[in-house]
């Protein structure tokens, strides 16, 4: 990434009519702080099963509450395990409060907006459990917008 970004940004600047979109991997979110400007300039996309925009009110509130409760910042890892635990717990506890023992048959009706981790469960087979098939596309547009797209 560190080798290709300067080359691609140079190409886009020298040939502004060229259509360049950069598509990357989930671990690219770990490089956002270092390459934010290039990500916007190159209209960058990456896919991930987890992502949070730290500027959204829910993320800000969660981060402040985490700091208050635990007296420290969340580790800079991806996924952020504090948020992963919250999203997972909230999803299933809310589901149990709504549907009780019928949650398994109503997973597709859960319409919560998580902070970081999405859920879309699919049964593996009649005798097995479920797998989470939720994937997001994260896009950094040339207009400096950060968009988290649901991909079902």
Regions found by a protein language model. Name each.
Residues 1-152:
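Extracytosolic ligand-binding ectodomains
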